[in-house]
């Protein structure tokens, strides 16, 4: 299912009051964006790696963000990463939706109870993570295009010095 359709269904579920179902959709979207952000620049400068664990992906994204010299992006990533770590932590964190309980079917009533406010916080987390992933992917595409056209530019400048 395309990401925008999954997002629309998540919003529709929240509007209809089906918060737990909406949150399940949002967890899939969060994982997708986290993987997309971690895969930026893979195979361009260094050998392509596969990041299976969330902590490995977070460390890769952290490394990318810190290399960009963009204060806003560093601040945004720091806040998003801290909240995302709470959401996906092994042990439940007070006041944060516990992903593992909902996704893996832990039917402890307290852990799977989702309210509108918590679902809205998860949407905002996804939107910000999407913004970061798109930013990294756009930068990657610019670098990829630059590397594609660089040899012809060098030859042109060599043949036509100004």
Residue ranges of model-derived segments:
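Acidic, Ser/Thr-rich low-complexity intrinsically disordered segments
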Residues: 151-162
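Charge-enriched, short contiguous segments at helix-coil
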Residues: 81-151
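Short, flexible loop/turn elements at secondary-structure junctions
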Residues: 14, 18, 27, 31-34, ...
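Charged alpha-helical initiation segments
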Residues: 1-20
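Amphipathic, non-membrane alpha-helical segments in soluble helical-bundle scaffolds
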Residues: 19-23, 89-92
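Residue-level detector of well-ordered alpha-helical segments, enriched
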Residues: 21-26, 98
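Short non-catalytic regulatory patches outside canonical folded cores
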Residues: 24-83
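Short, flexible/disordered secondary-structure transition segments
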Residues: 21, 40-41, 109-113
């Amino acid at each position: 299912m395309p990401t925008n359709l999954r997002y629309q269904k998540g919003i529709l579920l929240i509007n209809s009051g089906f918060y737990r179902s909406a949150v399940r959709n949002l967890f899939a979207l969060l994982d997708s964006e986290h993987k997309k952000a971690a895969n930026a620049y893979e195979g361009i400068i260094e050998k392509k790696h596969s990041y299976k664990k969330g902590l490995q992906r977070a460390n890769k994204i952290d490394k990318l963000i810190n290399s960009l010299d963009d204060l806003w992006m560093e601040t945004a990533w720091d806040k998003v990463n801290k909240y995302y770590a709470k959401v996906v932590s092994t042990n439940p964190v007070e006041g944060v939706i516990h992903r593992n309980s909902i996704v893996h079917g832990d039917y402890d009533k307290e852990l799977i109870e989702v309210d509108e406010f918590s679902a809205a916080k998860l949407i905002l987390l996804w939107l910000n993570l999407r913004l970061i992933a798109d930013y990294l992917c756009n930068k990657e595409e610019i670098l990829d295009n630059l590397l594609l056209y660089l040899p012809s530019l060098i030859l042109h400048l060599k043949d036509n010095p100004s």
